């Protein structure tokens, strides 16, 4: 059994919040640079070059990539041999989010009641936390700030087995086409297939934590990722939704078992700033 004081979790989460909002992952930067070289639309190329200038400035000055620093989504993998001491784990995570957003001068975008009061919490808490227990004595944390422009354009469809792979392709492409400029393309497309209604949605979100360029380990789904990326880019939505050949930088699929009578499919979109930061304790 390994003991970890939750104060270490708090400080780690605070740093990840700031890092994820300031520094774009290298894989994302490489994809945007490559897209700027191959984009067919002159306006689209100009937009992509502006995105490059933006992430270079944010890294140089340690300032947010975007004013929408999102709700904080935390994916936790906790080794079953870990024992947390010094407080409650989730409270420690929320404290880390608060510290990161206050100390990092990040916009606070969380309201407590979604319908009536809609009062801002003032520190971007609470975080949205997904926890998985794994073998070992380590704790892995992935922090993904998620803005609402892209989040609002996600979709879920309870497909039937008879819809098959063609039904999945149509749903994904239709979702991207309907989203248009709203998710700030070029986007990353997270697709969750299987499970039930809520698991498909979580899988789609989790798919966005995978580094751009990393394919699903199953070659069938890896091939589907490539095919979907090609289909999405043929929509012509383009950078900022103003037309062009670069609508998406990547498509990531996660899948799991499901009921014999169903094939749920969820799509979660990231904007061109596929923000993430991770650490292990």
Regions found by a protein language model. Give the residues of each.
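Non-transmembrane, aqueous-exposed alpha-helical and coiled segments at domain scale
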Residues: 1-281
């Amino acid at each position: 059994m390994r003991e970890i004081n939750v104060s270490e979790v708090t400080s780690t989460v605070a740093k990840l919040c700031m890092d994820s909002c300031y520094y774009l992952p290298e894989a994302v930067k490489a994809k945007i640079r490559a897209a700027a070289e191959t984009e067919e639309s002159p306006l689209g190329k100009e937009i992509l070059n502006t995105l490059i200038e933006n992430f270079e400035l944010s890294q140089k000055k340690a300032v947010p990539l975007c004013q929408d620093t999102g709700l904080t989504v935390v994916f936790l993998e906790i080794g079953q041999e870990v024992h947390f001491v010094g407080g409650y784990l989730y409270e420690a995570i929320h404290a880390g989010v608060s510290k990161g957003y206050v100390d990092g001068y990040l916009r606070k975008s969380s309201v407590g009641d979604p319908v009536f009061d809609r009062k801002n919490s003032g520190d971007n808490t609470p975080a949205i936390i997904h926890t998985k227990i794994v073998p070992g004595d380590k704790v892995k944390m992935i922090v993904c700030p998620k803005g609402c422009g892209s989040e609002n354009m996600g979709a879920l469809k309870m497909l039937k087995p008879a819809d098959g792979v063609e039904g999945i392709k149509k749903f994904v492409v239709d979702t991207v086409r309907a989203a248009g400029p709203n998710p700030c393309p070029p986007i990353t497309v997270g697709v969750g297939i299987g499970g039930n209604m809520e698991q498909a949605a979580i899988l789609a979100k989790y798919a966005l934590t995978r580094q751009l360029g990393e394919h699903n380990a199953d070659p069938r789904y890896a091939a589907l990722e490539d095919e979907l990326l090609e289909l999405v880019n043929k929509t012509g939505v383009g950078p900022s939704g103003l037309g062009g050949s670069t609508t998406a930088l990547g498509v990531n699929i996660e899948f799991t078992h499901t009921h014999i009578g169903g094939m749920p499919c969820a799509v979660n979109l990231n904007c061109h700033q596929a923000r993430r930061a991770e650490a292990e304790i």
